[in-house]
Amino acid sequence: MKTLLLSLVVVTIVCLDLGYTRLCLSDYSIFSETIEICPDGHNFCFKKFPKGITRLPWVIRGCAATCPKAEARVYVDCCARDKCNR
């Protein structure tokens, strides 16, 4: 009985997320995705991509403490959910 109780306590500690951490995509394609664990205080995911370019545009994804500002000819999408920056 003690062994079962100890096992349950260990499993609970391992599985319990004591602090919430945002998960953002740092790379994404239809074939794969790379997830970034954001540091404390970085509660937003973002995606930057060029305006008006239709072929093979570059895309920058990551975590941010605040939403990045849009630049000339660059769109910025910002969101506050896990892996929302597809």
UniProtKB/Swiss-Prot annotation:
Entry's Gene Ontology cellular component terms: extracellular region
Keywords: Disulfide bond, Secreted, Signal, Toxin
Main location: secreted
Disulphide bonds in the chain: 24-45, 38-63, 67-78, 79-84
Entry's localization field: Secreted
Keyword Secreted belongs to the record: yes
Entry GO MF terms: toxin activity
Record bears the keyword Nucleotide-binding: no
Tissue expression pattern: Expressed by the venom gland.
Signal peptide: 1-21
Similarity comment: family membership: Belongs to the three-finger toxin family. Short-chain subfamily. Orphan group I sub-subfamily.
The protein's name in its UniProt record: Neurotoxin-like protein NTL2
